[in-house]
Regions:
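Sec-dependent signal peptide recognition
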Residues: 1-8
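Hydrophobic h-region of N-terminal signal peptides that target proteins for export
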Residues: 8-17
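Boundary/entry segment of secreted carbohydrate-active catalytic domains
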Residues: 20-53
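C-terminal domain-boundary segment and adjacent tail
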Residues: 23-34, 66-67, 74-76, 158-166, ...
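Metal-dependent polysaccharide deacetylase catalytic core of the NodB/CE4 family, i.e.
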Residues: 38-40, 60-148, 158-171, 195-204
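Extracytoplasmic/secreted proteins, especially bacterial periplasmic and envelope-associated proteins
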Residues: 39, 50, 54, 108-111, ...
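Active-site metal-binding loops of divalent metal-dependent hydrolases
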Residues: 44-47, 97, 200, 232
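A Trp-anchored, charged/polar loop motif used as the substrate-binding/catalytic surface
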Residues: 173-185
Length: 243
C-alpha cells in the first residue's frame, strides 16, 4: 500500500504548501482536562480488516479511543462493513476518501469526500461534529491535485473536515518497542500532543505486529494518570477553543 505518508491536520486555518504541520510538541500549562500533562490519540488508515479483529477489542479493554480512516469504496471495506457499523464506543471513523485513488480535479475531490462522509454518517450516526481527514498517499493536498490553499480551506469547510496532523508511526518512526515507549515518555515530558498512526495490526500491510501494538497500549495505560486520551477531533477542538 502506498498510504505510508497519509497525513495530518490543521489546528489553525493555514494549510502548509508542502507538508501538513506536525502535532504541537508543547502547549501552555493547564490546557488538558483534569490536570493531565499531555494529550495522545491513535489513528488507523485504510480500514484494514485486522483493525476490526485485533484493534477494536484492545481499545475497549484499555478504554482508549481510536480514529479509523476508511475508504468505503473498497470491496475489502464492504466485506467487513457490519464490523465497522457495530464497533464499540471507542471506535471513531475518519475520512480517507472513497477510493484512495487518483483525484484528477476538484470536482472529483468533492465526490470522494462527500461519498466517504455519507458512509460514515450511515454507519456511525451517533458520531457528531467535524470529521477527521487523512489525505491518502501524500503529505499535502498540493501533492494530490492542483489546488490553492484557499480552495483547500473552502473544501474542508464545505465537507466539515479537519485535516489530521502529519503522520507519525511505524515503519517511519518508532520502529521498535523501546523507541515507541521512549516516544510516549517524551510526549508526557513535553506536555504536547502525541500520536501513533497505523495501518495493519497483526496482519495486512505496513504491520508492526500485534505484540508491538499491545506493548503500546500497556505503555499508555501505565501512564494513564498523566495522559488525556482523546480523538484527533477532540484535541483539535480543545486547542481551538482555548485560543
Amino acid at each position: 500500500m502506498n498510504a505510508l505518508f497519509a497525513i495530518a491536520a490543521l489546528v489553525a486555518a493555514a494549510v502548509a504548501a508542502d507538508k501538513s504541520p506536525e502535532s504541537p510538541s508543547s502547549v501552555p500549562s493547564g490546557t488538558w482536562p483534569d490536570g493531565k500533562k499531555a494529550a495522545f490519540y491513535l489513528s488507523f488508515d485504510d480500514g484494514c480488516p485486522t483493525q476490526t479483529t485485533n484493534v477494536f477489542p484492545l481499545l475497549e479493554k484499555y478504554r482508549i479511543p481510536g480514529t479509523f480512516y476508511v475508504c468505503p469504496g473498497w470491496d475489502l471495506f464492504k466485506k467487513y462493513e457490519s464490523a465497522w457499523s457495530n464497533a464499540n464506543e471507542y471506535v471513531f471513523l475518519g475520512n480517507h476518501t472513497m477510493t484512495h485513488g487518483k483525484i484528477p480535479d476538484k470536482a472529483a475531490l468533492d465526490r470522494e469526500l462527500a461519498g466517504c462522509n455519507a458512509v460514515i454518517a450511515r454507519l456511525r450516526p451517533k458520531q457528531k461534529g467535524p470529521v477527521s481527514f487523512a489525505i491518502p498517499a501524500a503529505e499535502s493536498m498540493h501533492k494530490v491535485l492542483e489546488i490553492t490553499d484557499e480552495e483547500i480551506a473552502e473544501t474542508y469547510k464545505r465537507h466539515n473536515l479537519v485535516e489530521r496532523w502529519l503522520w507519525h508511526g511505524y515503519p517511519v518512526q518508532c520502529k521498535t518497542i523501546p523507541e515507541m515507549e521512549a516516544y510516549v515518555d517524551k510526549v508526557i515530558e513535553s506536555g504536547g500532543v502525541g500520536h501513533m498512526d497505523f495501518h495493519g495490526v497483526g496482519g495486512d500491510w505496513l504491520d508492526p505486529g500485534l505484540e508491538y501494538f499491545e506493548a503500546l497500549m500497556k505503555k499508555l495505560d501505565s501512564r494513564r494518570g498523566e495522559i488525556w486520551f482523546a480523538t484527533h477531533i477532540q484535541i483539535y477542538e480543545r486547542l481551538k477553543n482555548r485560543k
